[in-house]
UniProtKB/Swiss-Prot annotation:
Organism: Arabidopsis thaliana (Mouse-ear cress)
Main subcellular location of this protein, as a coarse class: plastid
GO terms for cellular component: chloroplast thylakoid membrane; photosystem II
A Gene Ontology molecular function term of the record: chlorophyll binding
Boundaries of the annotated transit peptide in chain numbering: 1-73
Membrane topology: Multi-pass membrane protein
UniProt KW Isomerase keyword: no
Similarity remark: Belongs to the ELIP/psbS family.
Protein name per its UniProtKB record: Stress enhanced protein 1, chloroplastic
UniProt entry tagged with the keyword Coiled coil: no
Localization annotation: Plastid, Chloroplast thylakoid membrane
A single GO BP: response to wounding
Induction: Present at low levels under low light conditions, but accumulates under high-intensity light. Induced by UV-A illumination. Fades out upon wounding.
Role played: May be involved in non-photochemical quenching, a process that maintains the balance between dissipation and utilization of light energy to minimize generation of oxidizing molecules, thereby protecting the plant against photo-oxidative damage. May play a photoprotective role in the thylakoid membrane in response to light stress.
Length: 146
């Protein structure tokens, strides 16, 4: 059984690279490790277990504290609707959440819970086409009313 060594790398720059001594191989018979005396304190964040970002971040703001005003305009309102579309949307969201919960809890797909073990391609295509056509019809009808 062969042992594999996992290593992480870290890119860094040295301000005084001319003072860097040549790297030496510590033990040539075992796995190859390079020892650089000047870099003994610098380790990768993965190997040392430290967070990827430094804990103390100093951020400087340019300019003063300017307040930016943002205006948001919505074209939709619930005042003119009958409320049916709102409740249908809420029902669809709750139904989707229930379906996902049932799939996670049972470990079976939605069709398997209804007794269909393998999906039927023609039925799936027909249902998809029907839903697509009905969605397009409802979208075009609602846009013609406005």
């Amino acid at each position: 059984m062969a042992l594999s060594q996992v290593s992480a790398s870290l890119a860094f720059s040295l301000p005084n690279s001319g003072a860097l001594k040549l790297a030496t191989i510590t033990n040539p018979t075992s796995t190859c490790r390079v020892h650089v005396p000047q870099l003994a304190g610098i380790r990768s964040t993965f190997a040392s277990g430290s967070p990827l970002l430094p804990l103390k971040l100093s951020m400087t703001r340019r300019g003063g504290n300017r307040a930016a005003s943002v205006s948001i305009r919505s074209e939709q309102s619930t005042e003119g609707s009958s409320g049916l579309d709102i409740w249908l949307g809420r029902g669809a969201m709750v139904g989707f959440a229930v379906a996902i919960t049932v799939e996670i809890s049972t470990g079976k797909g939605l069709l398997e819970n209804f007794g269909v073990a393998s999906p039927l391609p023609t039925v799936a295509l027909a249902v998809t086409a029907l839903v697509g056509v009905l969605a397009a019809v409802f979208i075009f009808q609602s846009s013609s009313k406005n």
